[in-house]
Each structure stands twice: as C-alpha cells, then as structure tokens.
UniProtKB/Swiss-Prot annotation:
GO terms for molecular function: structural constituent of ribosome. The keyword Ribosomal protein applies. Keywords: Ribonucleoprotein, Ribosomal protein. The keyword rRNA-binding does not apply. Pfam families: Ribosomal_L35p. Coiled coil: none annotated. This is Large ribosomal subunit protein bL35. PROSITE patterns: RIBOSOMAL_L35. InterPro entries: Ribosomal_bL35 (IPR001706), Ribosomal_bL35-like (IPR021137), Ribosomal_bL35_CS (IPR018265), Ribosomal_bL35_sf (IPR037229). Belongs to the bacterial ribosomal protein bL35 family. GO terms for biological process: translation. One of its GO terms (cellular component) is cytosolic large ribosomal subunit.
C-alpha cells in the first residue's frame, strides 16, 4: 500500500504548535483594508488557535498523514 499523502491545502493554511494545538491565520486581512479600521486590521494580522476539538482532529489527520 502506498504512503498516505498530507493534504497540501491544509498544510499551507494550518500549522501545528509544539503543544499539539492547530494555529491558523484570520480571514479578511489581505486586501481591501482601506475601509476597515486600524484596530480591526491589527487584530486580523494576528494568528489564532482552533477552538473546536473535532475540527482540530480532522486537520491534524490531514497535515500529519
């Protein structure tokens, strides 16, 4: 049986931290920023951790396959 390949789209969007949590980038922070206020754009450039453990397990399986 061939090796399992990791999901390339998931690998580009998510990173696993040292503690095993999944880190993601926030959406809506790359363009059309002129009508968003400064506080919002600052917040959009910060990365976030996934909250739902079910989704976390699915993404870990895709990344580490």
């Amino acid at each position: 049986m061939p090796k399992m390949k990791s999901h390339r789209g998931a690998c580009k969007r998510f990173k696993a931290t040292a503690s095993g949590r999944i880190k993601r980038e926030r959406m809506n922070g790359s363009h059309n920023l002129e009508h968003k206020n400064r506080k919002r754009t600052r917040r959009l450039h910060q990365s976030a951790l996934l909250e739902c453990t079910k989704k976390e397990r699915q993404i870990k399986r895709m990344i580490l396959a």
